C-alpha cells in the first residue's frame, strides 16, 4: 500500500512539474512577440512603390535603421527573411521596391533589362533609393543612424547610396556589382563601405574590382573588401541552387561568414548604440 501511495505521489509530482514547465514555456512565448513585416506603399516620380517595413516587437524610438536593396528579381523571400532577422535584432528594416508597382520581373531576361536600366541611369536608381530611405525613417528609424545593404543588383545600389552622398553611416554590398560608368568622376565617399565578394564570382571582372579599389582610394573611403573562397555570384541566395558551374549558386559557408562580417560591421558603425547583436544567422 505504501509503495502504491509513493508511486501515485511521484506520478502526480511529475505531472505537476510538466504542467509548470509548459506554463513557463507559454509565458515565455507570449512575452517574446515576433516582429511585424508590413507592406508599405510610397511613391517616387509619380510611380507607386510597394516595399516592406520590418518593425521590432519592442520598437524603440529612433532605433538604427537598415535599408535593404533586393537582387534583380525584386523583393523575394530572401529579402523578407533578412528584414525579419534584423528586426529581431532590434533594428527598423525596410525593403525597397526599385522597379515599382506592376513592374515585377517574371523572368531573368526581364530582370536583366530592368536592372540594366537603373545601372545605366544611376541618378534614377539613387532617387528610388532616396525614396526608400525616407520610407524607412517614417517607419521609425533614426535618420542619423542608417546603414544601406544590398544583394547582387542591390549591392550595386548600396554603393550608389555612398556615391550619392546620402546621410547614411555605412553601406554593405553582398555579391554586388562594383563598377560605374568610366565617365563618372570619383568623388568623396563618406559612409563606411563593406564589400562581401565571392572569390570565384565571374560576373565581376578584375578590371571592375580594380576600378572600385581606385574609387575607394580616390574617395578617401573607410572601406573593406572580403573574399570568400569557393563562392560564386549570389552566394547568400538559396534559390540560386548549388551548381557553381552556372556562375550563381548558394554557398552556406560564405553565407554564414558574410553575415558574421556584416554584424561586426553594424556593431562598429553604430558604435554599440543599440541591441545585443547576434552574429549567428537563423
Please state what every model-predicted region is.
Residues 26-33, 38-139, 237-249:
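Serine-hydrolase catalytic machinery in alpha/beta-hydrolase-like enzymes
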Residues 82, 205-216:
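Short alpha-helix in the alpha/beta-hydrolase fold that links the catalytic acid
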Residues 140-151:
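Alpha/beta-hydrolase fold nucleophile elbow
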Residues 150-154, 158:
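Gly/Ala-rich beta-loop-alpha elbow adjacent to hydrolase catalytic centers
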Residues 167-177:
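A conserved short beta-strand
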Residues 195-197:
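Short beta-strand/loop motif that positions the catalytic acidic residue
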Residues 200-204, 233:
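Acidic catalytic loop of the alpha/beta-hydrolase fold
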Residues 222-282:
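C-terminal catalytic histidine-bearing segment of alpha/beta-hydrolase fold enzymes
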Amino acid at each position: 500500500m505504501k509503495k502504491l501511495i509513493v508511486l501515485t505521489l511521484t506520478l502526480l509530482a511529475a505531472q505537476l512539474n510538466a504542467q509548470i514547465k509548459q506554463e513557463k514555456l507559454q509565458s515565455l512565448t507570449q512575452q517574446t512577440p515576433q516582429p511585424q513585416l508590413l507592406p508599405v506603399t510610397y511613391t517616387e516620380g509619380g510611380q507607386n512603390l510597394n516595399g516592406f517595413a520590418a518593425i521590432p516587437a519592442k520598437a524603440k524610438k529612433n532605433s538604427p535603421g537598415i535599408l535593404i536593396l533586393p537582387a534583380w528579381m525584386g523583393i523575394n523571400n530572401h529579402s523578407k527573411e533578412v528584414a525579419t532577422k534584423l528586426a529581431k535584432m532590434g533594428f527598423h528594416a525596410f525593403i525597397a521596391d526599385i522597379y515599382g508597382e506592376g513592374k515585377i520581373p517574371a523572368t531573368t531576361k526581364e530582370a536583366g533589362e530592368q536592372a540594366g536600366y537603373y545601372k545605366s541611369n544611376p541618378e534614377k536608381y539613387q532617387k528610388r533609393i532616396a525614396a526608400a530611405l525616407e520610407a524607412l525613417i517614417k517607419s521609425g528609424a533614426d535618420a542619423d543612424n542608417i546603414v544601406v545593404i544590398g544583394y547582387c543588383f542591390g549591392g550595386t545600389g548600396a554603393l550608389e547610396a555612398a556615391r550619392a552622398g546620402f546621410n547614411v553611416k555605412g553601406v554593405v554590398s553582398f555579391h554586388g556589382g562594383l563598377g560605374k560608368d568610366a565617365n563618372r568622376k570619383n568623388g568623396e565617399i563618406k559612409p563606411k563601405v563593406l564589400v562581401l565578394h565571392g572569390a570565384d564570382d565571374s560576373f565581376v571582372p578584375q578590371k571592375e574590382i580594380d576600378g572600385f579599389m581606385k574609387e575607394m582610394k580616390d574617395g578617401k573611403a573607410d572601406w573593406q573588401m572580403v573574399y570568400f573562397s569557393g563562392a560564386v555570384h549570389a552566394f547568400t541566395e538559396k534559390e540560386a541552387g548549388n551548381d557553381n558551374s552556372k556562375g550563381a549558386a548558394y554557398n552556406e559557408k560564405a553565407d554564414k561568414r558574410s553575415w558574421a562580417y556584416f554584424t561586426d560591421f553594424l556593431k562598429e558603425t553604430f558604435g554599440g548604440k543599440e541591441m545585443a547583436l547576434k552574429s549567428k544567422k537563423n
